[in-house]
């Protein structure tokens, strides 16, 4: 139930909130805001995917979901499980610009 609420929140942010913010920034010619909202939108998509994967695993196994280390890009917020990538696929940040949560 909590995971579904989190997924719903992420989907709202993806489909409504950041999409609207990004379009408004484009219309106003705000390049910095466009980049920030682009990064936020991309990060929210990864968050939604992680929540959906976790919910599917939990629904099918009825057990706690083991997670490896979580890596978060300090520049754009892109999030992934496992090893730190050489560079962020969203913003190109180098691996030393990631935070690890184990």
Task: Locate each region found by the language model.
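Non-heme di-metal
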Residues: 1-102
